[in-house]
Amino acid sequence: MKKHGILNSHIAKLLADLGHTDTIVIADAGLPVPPGVPKIDLALTLGTPGFREVTKLIADEMVVEKVTAAQEIESVNPGQAAFLKAEFSNQKIDYIPHEAFKKATSQAKAVIRTGEATPYANCILHAGVIF
């Protein structure tokens, strides 16, 4: 049994298998998952686990080169937008329209669904390299 870090075997394998520029999505409870993209469903109840908690844990174990979020998050959910800016202060954050964001999720290696119940609390994490 692992002693540290993410214990969820699906997420641990996903992170270990990522290559440079691969993407994963951290999603709120309502984001649709495109056909063919694996979903790792962590949602237990509305709000649990939350977007911030899951995003922080993933970011601690992943080399993140850049982040993509829906541009609507800045006006509709400024608290989550501020969290993303603080958490990824050393990475570029691209803001795109929500419809384009949903289309971009079709290229992800997986969608990790949280129980988050606030609007536009989603992000695409683009893998970097450790060297």
Swiss-Prot record:
Q: Which residues form the active site?
A: H20 (proton donor)
Superkingdom, taxonomy of origin: Bacteria
**Annotated residues for binding of substrate:** D28, H98, Y120, A121, N122
Query: Has keyword Isomerase?
Result: yes
Please provide an example of a Pfam family that matches this protein in its UniProt record. Answer: RbsD_FucU
- Give the Enzyme Commission number: 5.4.99.62
Q: Where can this protein be found?
A: Cytoplasm
GO biological process terms, alphabetically, are: D-ribose catabolic process
UniProt entry keywords in alphabetical sequence = Carbohydrate metabolism, Cytoplasm, Isomerase
Q: Which InterPro entries match?
A: D-ribose_pyranase, RbsD-like_sf, RbsD_FucU
EC top class named in words: isomerase
Quote a single Gene Ontology cellular component term.
Answer: cytosol
Q: Which GO terms describe its molecular function?
A: D-ribose pyranase activity; intramolecular lyase activity; monosaccharide binding
**Could you say which protein family the record assigns here?**
Belongs to the RbsD / FucU family. RbsD subfamily.
- Record text on subunit structure and interactions: Homodecamer.
Descriptive protein name? D-ribose pyranase
